[in-house]
Amino acid sequence: FLSMYLNLIFVQNGYGKYCMDMEVNDISAIRYPCPRYIELPRKPLEDRLTAEDKQLLLQAFVRNKDELEHQIEESNKVGDKILILTDPVCTLDVREQIFRDIIKMYEKEGTIFLKPHPRDLLDYQKLFVEYPQFDASMPMEMLNFFPNLRFKKVVTIFTEVKGLPFADEAVRLGPDFMDAYEDPLIHRQNEQI
């Protein structure tokens, strides 16, 4: 009541006064759904796009499209690709260590690509210069539109990665992984409600 109607306290996941609804691709993938979630799968929208539409979207959202297409082509010659999706967790120094550890866990399996989260303020371009990177402002769904782009694995901490058409396997490390890096009370908020 205090958050939904009076806006006196902040509670995440759509319980705020100004949230009318939250569109999600698949409600079943959410462990603690909010009554304001509305399931609206993106697949029917995507299926209507032509090849030209997809290229136009890539041009609009991907700043370094030509460079990335070249890196994708080169990595296709070498072998498997691993995509690591970052999350805006912890302090910046701890976050850097987290993603260095994740890279170390998966770099033997293929060429590492990074896709920073839009709210992630860590400077991956500077700190992880040796890895190809997708722009943080680019929606993850744009990866569906790169021709010949296939990842052996997509790895993330908290981002939902169920059913990604450009990945053979999705790995969501989750709160158990994060327990090693910060107090569990910080990232297990939904479990406390």
Give the positions of each predicted feature.
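Active-site and donor-binding regions of nucleotide-sugar-utilizing enzymes
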Residues: 1-27, 145-149, 160-163
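Well-ordered, non-membrane alpha-helical segments in soluble/globular domains
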Residues: 1-4, 93-106, 136-142
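Structural motif
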Residues: 12, 20-22, 85-90, 115-118, ...
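Short, charged/polar "capping" segments at the starts of alpha-helices
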Residues: 91-94, 120-126, 178-182
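Catalytic donor nucleotide-activated moiety binding site of glycosyltransferases and closely related
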Residues: 107-136
